């Protein structure tokens, strides 16, 4: 029974790889969407055809991008290519982190438990609240003067 489950996991992983041996994952955060491609390599990470260190000058965003690879110990064994659009740098970093986690789950199905317990496969559903009429922003009212 365990052998059947193991072969099923292997065939599912084999089906999800493209002809070049790469796997894809899509991540979203706020208004950002990231398409992440993971393949065997030396640890290079490119975001929109630029090194991720140049693309994300803020260390917090770089750490968010690397978080999945560091957790799985795959920082030096895979290359990551990302196309990301929309939103700001923090939203894009979050979208990349989710897309990378989904791609790594396809790359090796044994990683799923670790990714799920660390919360990397959970979509952060928080979105910007819309501005309401009769107010200055989503919640803040206009300045009030008694006299």
Regions found by a protein language model. Name each.
Residues 2-4, 10-28, 34-85, 90-147:
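Structured, basic alpha/beta domains of bacterial-type, RNA-associated proteins
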């Amino acid at each position: 029974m365990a052998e059947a489950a193991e072969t099923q996991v292997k065939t599912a992983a084999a089906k999800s790889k493209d002809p070049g041996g790469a796997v894809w994952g899509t991540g979203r955060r706020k208004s950002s969407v990231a398409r992440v491609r993971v393949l065997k390599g030396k640890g290079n990470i490119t975001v929109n055809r630029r090194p991720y260190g140049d693309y994300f000058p803020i260390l917090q965003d770089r750490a968010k991008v690397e978080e999945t690879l560091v957790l799985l110990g795959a920082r030096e064994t895979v290359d990551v290519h990302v196309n990301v659009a929309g939103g700001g740098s923090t939203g894009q970093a979050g979208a990349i982190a989710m897309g990378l986690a989904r791609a790594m789950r396809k790359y090796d199905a044994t990683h799923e438990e670790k990714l799920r317990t660390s919360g990397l496969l959970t979509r952060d559903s928080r979105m910007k609240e819309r501005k309401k009429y009769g107010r200055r922003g989503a919640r803040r009212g206009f300045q009030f003067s008694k006299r």
